[in-house]
């Protein structure tokens, strides 16, 4: 469960996030819709402790994200391609992410099988660095890496950006 309490973030005079109290329960699926600059990505970055709040806090399963990192073991996220290590190949990157979660190479390979259709033969085995992939294929690599360890909590910011229509189903 995610609990947001008195959460505020300002950039100069602009209030980007101002949430008094909000709870997201296990099993909930939530989508945020808003104009550019409305604070959606800022909220995700606050939840993931990538930005420091001006006021308030976020807890995930009763763990204050700004004070303890235990929540990271059961959380997967992809916000943008800045999350990717672009001097690796996708295979190297997936193995790196897997290793962070205690997965062996064989386990990573097994967990990639369900994503083969999503990758559409365009990601694996191409012998090129992530930086040389299209924005859509970088998006696929990020989404897959966020899901690789079967997280309890998954946070994706604009997951359909750059994806071909056939990849969105």
Which role fits each region the language model picked out?
Residues 154-158:
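Catalytic Walker B motif of ABC-type/P-loop ATPase nucleotide-binding domains
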Residues 33-35:
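The feature captures the beta-strand-to-loop junction immediately N-terminal to the Walker
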Residues 56-71:
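Conserved ABC transporter NBD signature motif
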Residues 48:
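Helix-to-loop junction immediately C-terminal to a conserved catalytic motif
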Residues 2, 17-19, 72:
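Conserved structural motif at the start of ABC-family nucleotide-binding domains
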């Amino acid at each position: 469960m995610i609990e947001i309490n008195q959460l505020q973030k300002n950039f100069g005079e602009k209030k980007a996030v101002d949430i008094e109290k909000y709870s997201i329960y296990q099993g909930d699926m939530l989508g945020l819709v808003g104009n550019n600059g409305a604070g959606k990505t800022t909220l995700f970055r606050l939840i993931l402790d990538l930005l420091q709040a001006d006021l308030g806090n976020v807890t995930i399963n009763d763990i204050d994200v700004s004070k303890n990192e235990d929540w990271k073991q059961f959380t997967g996220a992809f916000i943008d391609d800045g999350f990717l290590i672009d001097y690796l190949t996708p295979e190297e990157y997936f193995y790196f992410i897997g290793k962070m979660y205690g997965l062996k190479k064989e386990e990573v390979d097994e967990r990639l099988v369900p994503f083969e259709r999503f990758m559409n033969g365009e990601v694996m085995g191409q012998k090129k660095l992530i930086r040389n992939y299209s924005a859509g294929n970088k998006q696929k690599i990020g989404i897959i890496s966020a899901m690789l360890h079967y997280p309890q909590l998954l946070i994706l910011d604009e997951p359909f950006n750059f994806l071909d229509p056939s990849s969105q189903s």
